[in-house]
Design a protein with these regions (language model features):
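Generic structural hydrophobic/aromatic packing signal, biased to beta-strands
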Residues: 61, 116-118, 139
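N-terminal low-complexity, intrinsically disordered segments
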Residues: 1-106
């Protein structure tokens, strides 16, 4: 369901699947469909037995343009985040990216949810070598209390309630979030810093990954690299059958994994990333929850980070290859 009601609108640079997009050539972060209205909190009151109006402490949001209700009653501790503050966060992120542009903006669910999708380089994805990386920075906020304010990085542009929910639930792509409680101004400032860190890290990743593409490595050395890496904590122990099977899996991904040709250190890193993202837990990742936890929070994540350090340090990579070569030579005796 798109859930674009009469009070909602979705503006974009191209027509979305629902056919309701107001297609434009450019979207200005300072003047757009979300600047035409905002939210205002009004107190919920009652009249006591003496005929006096009393406040309950609860409130309700209404649109500043039509005074119609948005969402449901709010507790005293709930802090609404206005469209103005939401767009300030988007604007701050875009100011760091000269090529960034808004691809989609709007609201759904009777203005209960608002969203902005920004392409970082003026397109939905970018390539480093033959590999394609996701390039949308999605911002979402709920006036109806159905979600926190969130930011993620995916290749899915938010154009409706379905894509809003999809991006909200893609935990592996989450950049940052803030709940509607406490010091909202401080949380938004912190979130802005988180986005800055993300953008800086992404730019650094592109440069380093491009360097890895230029560094060639043979199939044999890649096998030694994987072996030496897996045995980095126990170099004096012999290679187990499980370790050798893991090396075989990594070597296969090095040569035939998505985007890989078995030619360079980028292929080696992609092989390790693919393995620890999808296949590293018991049963080759068949238990998706266990695999996800390992990949994003546990041993899988640590191994991906450690291998990134190894391949970006030439001396460390050579030492790892030497260790792997020695261990493999003992197996082949």
């Amino acid at each position: 369901m798109h859930n674009i009601t009469e009070r909602d609108a979705q503006v974009g640079l191209s027509q979305a699947w629902h056919g309701l997009t107001d297609v434009v050539d450019e979207i200005d972060v300072k003047e757009n469909v979300l600047t035409k209205w905002d939210v205002e909190r009004k107190p919920l009151t009652y009249v006591d037995v003496d005929g006096n109006e009393q406040e309950t402490g609860y409130g309700i949001l209404v649109g500043t343009d039509d005074d119609q209700i948005i969402g449901k009653p709010m507790t005293p501790s709930y802090k609404a985040i206005s469209n103005e503050k939401f767009l300030d966060l988007v604007s701050d992120a875009m100011s760091k990216l000269p090529k960034a542009k808004i691809e989609s903006i709007g609201s759904v669910c009777n203005r209960g949810k608002v969203f902005v999708t920004v392409s970082l380089d003026g397109k939905s994805n970018y390539k480093v070598g033959d590999r394609e990386f996701k390039d949308y920075l999605n911002f979402g906020n709920a006036h109806d209390q159905s979600s926190k304010l969130w930011i993620n990085n995916t290749n899915t542009c938010t154009v409706c309630d379905n894509t809003f929910t999809y991006n909200l639930n893609d935990k592996s792509a989450m950049v940052g979030s803030a709940v509607h409680r406490g010091d909202i101004e401080l949380k938004l400032a912190d979130l802005s810093n988180v986005v800055d860190d993300f953008l800086g890290t992404q730019a650094e990743f592109r440069q380093k990954f491009n360097n890895l593409l230029k560094r060639k490595i043979t199939d044999k050395k890649a096998q030694s690299l994987f072996t030496g890496f897996l045995m980095r904590n126990n170099p004096k122990e012999g290679l187990s059958t499980r370790c050798l099977n893991t090396v075989d899996s990594l070597n296969s991904l090095f040569k035939r994994g998505a985007g890989n040709r078995g030619e360079n250190y980028a292929d080696a890193f992609s092989a390790v990333t693919d393995y620890y993202t999808h296949n590293s837990t018991r049963g080759k990742g068949k238990n998706r929850l266990n695999q996800y936890v390992s990949s994003e929070f546990g041993l899988g994540r640590m191994n991906k980070q450690s291998f990134w350090t190894v391949v970006n340090n030439k001396d460390l990579a050579e030492r790892t290859i030497e260790r792997g070569t020695k261990l493999l030579s003992l197996v082949n005796q």
